[in-house]
From Swiss-Prot:
ATP binds at residues 174-181. The gene is KIN12E. SUPFAM superfamilies: P-loop containing nucleoside triphosphate hydrolases (SSF52540). GO terms for biological process: microtubule-based movement; spindle assembly. This is Kinesin-like protein KIN-12E.
């Protein structure tokens, strides 16, 4: 990967943004080193252009180092106040600052001084776009703000928070080239000098931090304040953590536990003591950081860097040791970038993808944190990215965070600037919970005991003050560490047997023993708490396992739903686009579940190792508790028992001394004052004895409690050991059971990842075509809009014509209705309103009539009762009149009674006649009243008819409403069917268009297939040719190897012959020497042996000549062997080269075959999609016909319902007219009677009653 040179000048080019001397004398040059002045600047280096003169309101440098006067002038004219708020951090934990960089000379040359943002004040900024967007933040820094001002506003409060014990974090966010690295690091080499204006936030922060630490040490000398600072520097490159201070480390892992929190394992931490040490570490880490050149930034950061400093402080105050610690994170994020703008390719594109992924995860985390701060329960995906996981405490946790959002005012970066402003606006709503990280520890129990003892000592000394005043010869000395005292008696010279030093040592021993016991008990409590915490962790692990099971169940449900949706797609119930979208969502959910399972599996292994470690720790603690601590406790118990015995012995001895003093006092009787002193002395000794006794009892109780706590802790350890063993066994079983599932899930994840990679590759290929077709799409959209408007106008005209035709048809049917449908509807509505008002009036009238009817019914009942009474009286009168006729025979029989009653009978006849006349009058009057009552009955019949007609009118109204609602529902259904028909027509057009595209793509894939086949055939031919050549070479090599074998065999034979000849020659030489010696001794006797010697000499010469020939042959054979070996080596090399070529060609052939298979598969998929499209077109055509049929059916139903509605309206009108006639008749009858009928009937009935009473009275008189 091409990186920029890591020399000092390169670091300056990267982070320095050094100020350069301007040619104009009006502006004062910034002092800097010669090295910084000699560094050359490039016009495309955005960072160097960004903050090249922080002192001069950040004006622009061009290629020659000249200041861009226009930009400087504009920036000066638009400057605002930039000051800190001292009370901000009291109520807030997150601060968001916007920083704008100046325009570069290249941007000014292209677009002038136009900007995409406008600063309104020190807290508000407006994005100039369509539409304008105004944003409000804590602070807004324009291009006039220098590094020093930025540090005073953001860096100084952060250092104060760190010194106060708060975790703090500062990170810069923005697109690439917006000035993040300059803001955070700046000129690092310049930071080593005190007056460098271009050094960034990090060196300034640490310079101020160490000066602040030095001031704290000077102010708090008495408290023995001690600071330690440890620094680490890491980067996150392609989602891998690298240690910038140790380049050999690679792919470090993030860990989380309850002690250290979130930390990087095996990360190098260096202790620093000054700002120079920190700058040195920064320079070392910056030299190892990944940077590369893009179109937008020559020195673009390709990774996120996190510089962490842990500050710890300790001091002692009033016997209590305070420990305060804080973590400071300074983060330089890599900038988000577009492939189109940055021109990233290859490795740069991969880096940009990982950067954008982590930044998008950061944005998602901030969005979910905002939702959480608003009270919603949303999962915050910290673990989706290593950056967010590392900054978990800084985002929504225990930290005070400063976010510096760097933006570019260039119009070409307006969309990126808007995205950064929206990100900062969301981040402003995060709520952190920052607390002071401080711990205080000390011997609180020992201090309490000492305070009690000192109080007792003070009270005792106050009580002894009177004795000291009475006798100056007695000196009393109080010991601060013990309630006992050392007294010197001037007369008898007696003193306590235990000296002050011994008492103090005893008390200290007691205190140390007690403190040790309490500390051990506290450690036991801490150990028990840790074990309970581990138990809770194991329970959480079990819950996570249950969550995994739920996730698997959810995956099964998703699979079932996917199968159902596929069945629906095959059956044609569900469209393909909806199915694909749903399948994509299900796959994303499944991937999330699988990711969570993978994370949980890692956690399971981590917890398993943690459990093993805890087992070992518990075993070790148990062995220590069983072996070492018991011995220590036994020793302490024995020491306490010895001290208790010593105190009791001293008490007994002191009591004997006091008895001896008493005897001496009784014998002498000379020192009265000594007796008083002795009594005081005895009282003090008794107090001391009482104190010792209480202390012994307390020690014994403490020993018993310690023994109990020891036994309880051992039992608890055994119980927890068993619990941990059980949990570990369960965990191992679950891990084994989940092993197969995890493997299957991993395979599924791999396949899904491969599928996603294929899809992303296709999207990348389609991206190029999409860019080309975007303009054509815009033109087509405009044309479609025009066509849609024309279509809407035609539809409106068609609807108007249809309404006019329908109104005309209804005009022929209805005689009274108007010509068009709209007027008919209006008249119908008016008629309905009139009918409603008439119905309300009718209801009122009916109510009044009903009230009158009830009154008439009451009166009628009264009259009927009177009539019945009158009829009863009439019957009685008739019966009375008939009774004298029946009594006449009886009276005639009695002569005496007839004589007496002749006169009375005459009178009675007269009375009877008058009574008959009155009764006849009453009967006539009753007949008249019966006629009047008949009028009431007719009126009642009219009212009943009116009620029936009102019910009928209500029923007709309800029917009319039902028909109207049916008509409205049919209209809505028809509208829906029309809309569905339009959608179906659009889909049909889209399908036809897509089918045409599929046809063109099928042709394209056919061509690709032909090319791939030709490629495969060419490679296969080439491969066959190479294989044939390789076979020829191998056969040639085999022949050479066979020849070499023969030659080697002949060489071996020659070697063996030479050896044999050498042996023979040696034998002949030996024999010749022996025979030569014998010939010199006796030449005469052994003449035959001389001839033999000559023969042997000849044989020797023959052998030597043969040996020479064989050696020559051997030399020639060796030459041939060497030639053969060279040829074989050459052939082997050729074979190897041929094999490598064959392997390469075979790989390329396999790749081409794979490409061919992919093209064939894609072609098949396109054909399948084309077939599906044809089937869908057929289905759409059928659906359109069905919709047309339904719309026609709905129109006919609407026509029928309208006819029924008209008939019901006519019927309602008839009923209404009949009801009105009946009501008018009833009213007329009531008016004619003029409400006097009831009065007349009452008068007539009263007259009848009076007549009946008179008749009855006459009858009584006649009797």
């Amino acid at each position: 990967m091409p990186f920029i040179s890591e020399t000092a000048s390169a670091i300056k080019r990267r982070f320095g943004f050094n100020d350069r001397p301007a040619p104009s004398e009006s502006l004062r040059s910034v002092p800097c080193t010669p090295e910084a002045n000699t560094v050359s600047r490039d016009n495309h280096t955005h960072q160097s252009l960004l903050f090249s003169s922080a002192v001069r309101s950040m004006p622009e440098l061009d290629e020659d180092g000249a200041i861009c006067a226009g930009s400087a002038q504009i920036s000066r004219s638009q400057s605002f106040e930039f000051n800190e708020d001292p009370a901000f951090w009291k109520d807030h934990n997150v601060q968001v600052i916007i920083r704008t960089r100046p325009l570069s000379s290249s941007e000014i040359s292209v677009q002038g001084n136009n900007k995409c943002v406008r600063q309104d004040n020190g807290q508000a900024i407006t994005w100039i776009g369509n539409p304008e967007s105004r944003f409000t933040f804590d602070l807004v820094a324009d291009e006039n703000v220098s590094q020093e001002q930025m540090f005073k506003v953001a860096g100084v409060p952060m250092v104060e928070n760190v010194v106060a014990g708060y975790n703090s974090c500062m990170f810069a966010y923005g697109q690439t080239g917006s000035g993040k690295t300059h803001t955070m690091l700046g000129d690092i080499e310049g930071g080593t000098r005190r007056h460098s204006v271009n050094c960034g936030m990090t060196p300034r922060v640490f310079e101020y931090l160490f000066s602040r630490i030095q001031k704290e040490k000077e102010v708090r000398k008495e408290e023995k304040l001690h600071f330690t600072c440890r620094c680490s520097f890491l980067e996150i490159y392609n989602e891998q953590i690298l240690d910038l201070l140790d380049p050999s480390s690679y792919n470090l892992q993030l860990r989380e536990d309850h002690k250290k929190g979130i930390h990087v394992e095996n990360l190098k931490e260096i202790e620093v003591s000054s700002a120079r040490d920190v700058i040195q570490q920064l320079m070392q880490g910056a030299a190892n950081r990944k940077v590369a050149a893009t179109n937008m930034n020559r020195a673009s950061s390709r990774s996120h860097s996190v510089f962490t400093c842990i500050i710890e402080s300790k001091w002692v105050s009033q016997g209590v040791t305070h420990h305060r610690f804080a973590r400071l994170n300074l983060v330089d994020l890599a900038g988000s970038e577009r492939q189109k703008s940055s021109g990233a390719e290859g490795e740069r594109l991969k880096e940009a993808t990982n950067i954008n992924k982590s930044l998008s995860t950061l944005g998602l985390v901030i969005m979910n944190l905002v939702s959480v701060s608003n009270g919603k329960s949303v999962h915050v995906p910290y673990r989706d990215s290593k950056l967010t996981f590392l900054l978990q405490d800084s985002l929504g946790g225990n930290s005070k965070t400063i976010i510096i959002a760097n933006i570019s005012p260039s119009s070409s970066c307006s969309l990126e600037t808007l995205s950064t402003l929206k990100f900062a606006q969301r981040a402003k709503l995060i709520k952190n919970n920052a607390i002071v990280n401080e711990d205080a520890s000390g011997d609180v129990i020992a201090m309490r005991l000492q305070i009690q003892q000192l109080k007792k000592e003070v009270t005792r000394l106050r009580g002894m003050g009177g004795v000291d005043n009475q006798d100056m010869d007695t000196i009393s000395m109080g010991c601060p560490a013990s309630p006992m005292s050392l007294k010197w008696d001037g007369f008898n010279g007696s003193f306590t047997p235990l000296t002050t030093h011994k008492r103090m040592s005893k008390v200290k021993d007691y205190e140390v023993a007690l403190v040790g016991a309490f500390r051990r008990e506290r450690e036991k409590d801490v150990a028990l708490q840790a074990l309970t915490a581990e138990n809770e962790a194991s329970m959480k692990l079990e819950k996570k396992r249950e969550d995994e099971i739920r996730g698997l169940k959810m995956m099964l449900k998703l699979r079932d739903s996917a199968i159902k949706s596929l069945q629906g797609v095959t059956s044609g119930k569900i469209p393909v686009e909806a199915h694909l979208q749903k399948e994509k969502g299900d796959l994303m959910k499944e991937i999330e579940v699988l990711r969570a399972q993978v994370d949980r599996n890692q956690e399971v292994t981590k917890f398993a190792t943690e459990n093993l470690r805890l087992k070992e720790e518990i075993r070790r603690l148990k062995s220590q508790g069983e072996e070492g601590e018991r011995d220590i406790l036994n020793q302490q118990i024995q020491a306490l028992q010895a001290k208790l015995l010593e105190a009791l012995d001293w008490k007994l001895m002191h009591e004997s001394d006091s008895s001896m003093v008493k005897e001496d006092g009784n014998i002498s009787n000379m020192f009265c004052s000594n007796q008083n002193q002795e009594s005081k002395k005895l009282s003090s000794i008794q107090d001391e004895n009482e104190f010792l006794r209480m202390q012994a009892i307390q020690n014994r109780a403490e020993m018993e409690s310690l023994q109990k706590s020891l036994s309880f802790s051992l039992d608890e350890k055994e119980r927890l050991q068993k619990l941990v063993d059980n949990l570990s066994n369960e965990l191992e079983g679950k891990i084994r059971s989940s092993g197969m599932v995890g493997d299957d899930d991993q395979m599924e994840v791999k396949t899904m990842v491969q599928a996603i990679a294929c899809v992303s590759q296709r999207e990348a290929e389609a991206h190029e075509t999409a860019i080309k077709l975007s303009k054509e799409n815009d033109d087509l959209r405009q044309k479609i809009k025009v066509l849609i408007e024309d279509n809407n106008k035609l539809i409106e005209l068609y609807e108007q014509v249809a309404e006019e035709n329908s109104s005309r048809a209804w005009g022929k049917i209805e005689t009274d209705s108007s010509s068009n449908n709209a007027d008919a509807q209006n008249s119908a509505e008016i008629a309905l309103e009139v009918e409603k008002s008439a119905a309300e009036e009718q209801k009122k009238m009916i109510g009044n009539l009903e009230n009158q009817l009830t009154e008439m019914h009451d009166e009628n009942e009264k009259l009927m009762s009177l009539y019945e009474n009158a009829m009863k009286e009439k019957d009685e009168l008739k019966r009375l009149l008939s009774s004298p006729d029946q009594k006449k025979p009886i009276e005639a029989n009695s002569d005496t009674e007839m004589e007496l009653c002749n006169i009375s009978s005459e009178k009675s006849t007269e009375d009877l006649n008058s009574a008959k006349l009155k009764l006849e009058l009453a009967q006539e009057k009753l007949s008249i009243s019966a006629k009047t009552i008949g009028v009431f009955s007719s009126l009642e019949e009219n009212i009943l008819d009116i009620i029936k007609l009102s019910k009928e009118s209500k029923e007709t109204e309800e029917k009319v409403k039902e028909h109207q609602s049916e008509l409205g529902s049919i209209k809505t259904v028809s509208d829906q069917t029309n809309a569905r028909k339009e959608v179906a027509e659009k889909k049909l057009a889209a399908l036809r268009c897509s089918l045409s595209n599929f046809a063109s793509s099928a042709v394209y894939f056919q061509q690709r297939e032909e090319r791939a086949r030709a490629h495969v055939n060419s490679f296969s031919g080439y491969l066959n040719q190479k294989n044939e050549e390789l076979d020829v070479i191998r056969s040639h090599k085999r022949e050479i190897d066979a020849a070499m074998g023969k030659i080697q065999q002949s060489e071996a034979e020659l070697k063996s012959n030479i050896v044999m000849l050498k042996i023979k020659v040696d034998e002949e030489n030996k024999r010749h020497e022996e025979e030569g010696v014998l010939c010199t001794i006796d030449n005469i006797l052994r003449t035959g042996k001389a001839t033999d010697l000559l023969k042997s000499q000849e044989e020797k010469t023959k052998l030597q000549s043969e040996m020479k020939l064989s050696r020559e042959k051997l030399a020639s054979v060796r030459k041939e062997v060497d030639d053969m070996t060279k040829k074989s080596l050459k052939l082997e090399k050729e074979i190897k080269t041929m094999e490598t070529e064959i392997e390469k060609s075979s790989k390329t052939r396999t790749e081409s075959e794979m490409e061919l298979e992919n093209t064939i598969q894609e072609k098949q998929t396109i054909q399948e999609m084309e077939e599906q499209g044809m089937s869908e077109i057929q289905n759409m055509i059928i659906e359109i016909h069905q919709l047309v049929f339904e719309s026609d059916l709905r129109k006919e139903e609407a026509m029928i319902i309208r006819e029924e509605l008209i008939a019901e309206e006519l019927r309602a009108k008839d009923v209404h007219t009949n009801m009105i006639e009946r009501v008018e008749n009833a009213l007329k009858t009531l008016e004619n009677q003029n409400n006097s009928v009831s009065g007349k009937i009452e008068e007539e009935v009263e007259n009848v009653l009076s007549l009946v009473h008179e008749a009855s009275r006459l009858l009584e008189v006649s009797h």
